[in-house]
């Protein structure tokens, strides 16, 4: 796994490469560092990785997986772009960055459009007929639509766990 402080001192380039590829500054705030920590410190996670049975994703990925009874392992571009592992230029998981964090890109979910049919759910039998899951979007990104920012030049500031403009 990458040690950002050591790597930065050693060659000064890792943080800049991450910023160029992901648009994000190297920080433990984002999931990449948290995924790396889990793999090094939680025995169940270590074992799942050894067994080639480890899946890593954000809350939307977990919700989709649970709601579809394990049939869908996916995320959307807005959530993938906030992991610090996703190359925003080629719209793929960046294998070089993943390697720095000790992550095999195959552990990460498929990345899809925000607006599409991901699967269906009966919500653990609550619905008699399964209903489609037709969208996934990050909270701050979704807040743009919720607040009516749908025209070029409109701006919104969101304050919560993180802040974004």
Model-derived features with residue positions:
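ATP-dependent carbohydrate kinase catalytic cores
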Residues: 72, 76-165
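Active-site phosphate-binding/coordination module
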Residues: 1-32, 139
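Flexible, glycine/proline-enriched loop segments at strand-loop-helix junctions
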Residues: 20-28, 51-54, 80-88, 133
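Rossmann-like flavin
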Residues: 18, 41-47
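NAD(P)-dependent dehydrogenases' Rossmann-like dinucleotide-binding region
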Residues: 54-60
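Class I SAM-dependent methyltransferase SAM-binding "motif I" and its flanking Rossmann-like core
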Residues: 38
């Amino acid at each position: 796994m990458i040690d950002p402080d050591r790597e930065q001192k050693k060659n000064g380039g890792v943080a800049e490469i991450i910023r160029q590829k992901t648009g994000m500054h190297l920080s433990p705030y984002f999931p990449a560092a948290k995924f790396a920590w889990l793999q090094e410190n939680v025995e169940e996670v270590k074992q799942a990785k050894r067994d080639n049975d480890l899946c890593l994703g954000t809350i939307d990925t977990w919700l989709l997986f649970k709601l579809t009874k394990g049939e869908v392992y996916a995320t959307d571009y807005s959530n993938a772009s906030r992991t610090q592992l996703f190359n925003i230029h080629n719209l793929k998981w960046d294998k070089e960055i993943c390697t720095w964090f000790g992550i095999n890109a195959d552990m990460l979910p498929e990345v899809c459009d925000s607006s599409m049919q991901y699967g269906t759910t009966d919500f653990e039998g609550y619905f008699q007929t399964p209903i489609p899951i037709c969208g996934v979007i990050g909270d701050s990104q979704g807040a743009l639509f919720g607040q009516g920012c749908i025209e070029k030049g409109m701006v919104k500031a969101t304050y919560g766990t993180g802040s974004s403009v």
